[in-house]
Amino acid sequence: MRLRFTKMHGLGNDFVMIDAISQKVTITPERARKLADRHFGVGCDQVLVVESPDNPDADFRYRIFNNDGSEVENCGNGARCFAVFVRQRQLTAKSDIVVETAAGLLRLHVLDDNQVTVNMGVPVLAPAQIPFVTPHEQPEYPLQLDNMEITISAVSMGNPHAVTLVDNLASFPVKTLGAQIETHAQFPNRVNAGFMELISRQEVKLRVFERGVGETLACGTGACAAVVSGIVRGLLDTTVAVHLPGGSLSITWEGAEKPVMMTGPAKAVFHGQVKL
């Protein structure tokens, strides 16, 4: 069969979008891996699938496959693309969209110029729920890598994140240390590794080594986790501009039991068909 798809990106974090409602298709991990292959497939960081929801409170089900075929709980940049995609495909005319994910419900609000605000939910700091193996919850934790010890914060935004403060982000060995953090034994489900440089209380730079993907141009959940970690440490204000290699996001968090709000762009690049 021929599969219709749309290529989209959120700040360079790129996606193959699949409408599995108007075309009957099942995306398996193997199919996702082939679609995501940049040499032999379409090529992307993640494959995002629109399905009919099981939850009656949701408009759609939102599934996320990394380019290694693994299915994950959440993707913030993908959520913005998802909201724009379902409107462009005329699957809905709503500007407020509720989607069902493996991590729960996400609420998306489409603004002008394809800017989207995503209610990313309340961040989780309890180690057992991230999951992160440690005796007690703390703002910071030591983490022993191959040849050094670093300090991290551990946050779940529906998916696990370890955030490290660095002095010079441009020269920091993100790929080397990111790979060690991703597969660290204290994170039983692996982890996304974020590296944050503070500019001011309202502005940071961030690079993210994503679980199952590697370093990407942008990571929405990573930006949220980084801001939460900075606020918990007393280093950041409630609204922060996060500058990623692919562009900038605005992240707001008003503290414990409050949801994190993320605003940023989503853009369609091209439409196509591929033989499965």
Swiss-Prot record:
Tell me the Gene Ontology biological-process terms attached to this UniProt entry: lysine biosynthetic process via diaminopimelate
Give the Gene Ontology MF terms in alphabetical order: diaminopimelate epimerase activity
Protein name, UniProt field: Diaminopimelate epimerase
Q: Which family does it belong to?
A: Belongs to the diaminopimelate epimerase family.
Q: Site annotation (Could be important to modulate the pK values of the two catalytic cysteine residues): which residues?
A: H161, E210
Q: Which reaction does it catalyse?
A: (2S,6S)-2,6-diaminopimelate = meso-2,6-diaminopimelate
Q: Name one Pfam family in it.
A: DAP_epimerase
Q: What is its EC number?
A: 5.1.1.7
The UniProt entry's GO CC annotations, sorted and at most eight, read: cytosol
Q: Which lineage ranks, top first, belong to the organism behind this chain?
A: Bacteria, Pseudomonadati, Pseudomonadota, Gammaproteobacteria, Cellvibrionales
Q: How does it assemble?
A: Homodimer.
List the signal peptide residues: none
The record places the site described as Important for dimerization at F270
Subcellular localization = Cytoplasm
Q: Which UniProt keywords apply?
A: Amino-acid biosynthesis, Cytoplasm, Isomerase, Lysine biosynthesis
- What enzyme class is recorded for this protein? isomerase
Q: Tell me, in a sentence or two, what this protein's role is.
A: Catalyzes the stereoinversion of LL-2,6-diaminopimelate (L,L-DAP) to meso-diaminopimelate (meso-DAP), a precursor of L-lysine and an essential component of the bacterial peptidoglycan.
* Binding sites annotated in the UniProt record for substrate: N13, Q46, N66, G76, N77, N159, N192, E210, R211, G220, T221
